[in-house]
Amino acid sequence: MKVGDEGAGDGGDEPQLVEELRVQEPSSPPVVAYRAARRFFTDPRTVGVAQAGPRTAAFMARTWARSREPVADPHAVPARPSLGLAVQVLLDELLISTMKNPRLLPRRADYERAGVEVAQAFELYRERGWLEDPESYHRTPGAPAVWSTRGERALGQPYEHLSFQSDYEPHRGEPGRERWLEMDANRTAHAWVLRQADPGRPWVVCVHGFGTGAPFLDLRAFRARRLHSELGLNVAVPVLPLHGPRQQAGVASGEGFMSIDLVDTVHALAQSAWDVRSLIAWARLIGRDAPVGIWGLSLGGYVASLVAAMEDGLACAIAGIPATDILDLYHRHSPPAVRKRALEHGALGPEATAVQNVVSPLVLRPKLSRERRFVFAGLGDRMSTSGQAHRLWEHWERPSVAWYPGGHVGFWWVGSVNRFVTEALVSCGLSAGPSGASPAPSLSSSET
């Protein structure tokens, strides 16, 4: 029996119960209780939690079967079934379930608007040559002319809260332009900064994932204290559009960044790249052209990969557990009925894919050399998926990579990931390694 199926039950008595409830007052306790229970058991989040265990079991069964097959691709790193992998996969599945808010499911008008705007964007991008040359869609920002900083603390960690005006605007004539510019809070860029006494020390720009944008989460996710105190780096963590203080009051962090409205996602990613590049220009300005590397996690891995295809002179680019294809994620994580209607209205399909390509790190070519590109990902990632990371790794000409036997959110507890990132920063000249320690050991078994 599926959770929430109407008419399902051991005795088949629910239709009679429903009929009895209909004749009662709408506000009577039995009716209220029944409706509340029905909402709970049909809520996609409840259904998702109930299905997390079976989904994990199915994944582990597939993993076991694949582990017994001959490995045809010498570059493939098959996952090995283990209790630790199962726990991390289950954690991913549970987290995915909590993100399936029924309030965010598209309505008929949303499908229609999204389909019309995709068609308009496709025609505009084709006419202006952006489909043939996606790089020409993007403009180059400068350092902010005016900025402000104030000292703050998060979980005992002092940092500077940097803010400046984001000068990004969608191109004139782009669908969704006016809607995007109406989001006032989003027009101020923010970043959490840990500066060395010498601003000329190298910088690492760390781009957070979807739904965060709070200093206590972002600084912890990147182990910013270690980057700053042990590796001797200046650290800047930009807040992505529609996240944290850039979101409208009363709206969850990240809401609207990835939705049925693909043109909003295009604007969000284009602005992400613009603002991160403005932050890099600022770091170079105050750091007297100090070297700058970029490291992103999840959605931040997507943005870091995008910036690596636009920004000259980066010391390194590290894509961690990266998302690389938004439409593929939409296909994967949306209910079948939503996917079907989106395809029917043109919100998904060939034109949508062409529109997405102007902000795709799988289409744009990275500007930095292969030895300065790095990828790490979990073989059991149920959110961004290891497949998306593998596509980026291939597009980046198979640079140094670390595959770990875990899920999306479990990277933080994997020691080999921490060593891999340290080695990347050391090998590119951003750091001499942890204070008083020799450089991190090579992960040659993970390199190709």
Stretches with model-predicted labels:
Residues M1-G176, P439-T448:
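N-terminal targeting or regulatory segments adjacent to alpha/beta-hydrolase or S9 domains
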Residues R201-G209:
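Short beta-strand element of the alpha/beta-hydrolase
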Residues H208-A270:
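Cap/lid segment of the alpha/beta-hydrolase catalytic domain
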Residues G287-L297:
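Alpha/beta-hydrolase fold nucleophile elbow
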Residues G296-G300, A304:
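Gly/Ala-rich beta-loop-alpha elbow adjacent to hydrolase catalytic centers
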Residues S305-E351, W403:
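Hydrolase active-site cap/lid region
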Residues L329-Q388, E394:
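The feature captures the conserved acid-bearing segment of alpha/beta-hydrolase catalytic domains
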Residues G407-N418:
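Catalytic histidine-centered segment of alpha/beta-hydrolase-like enzymes
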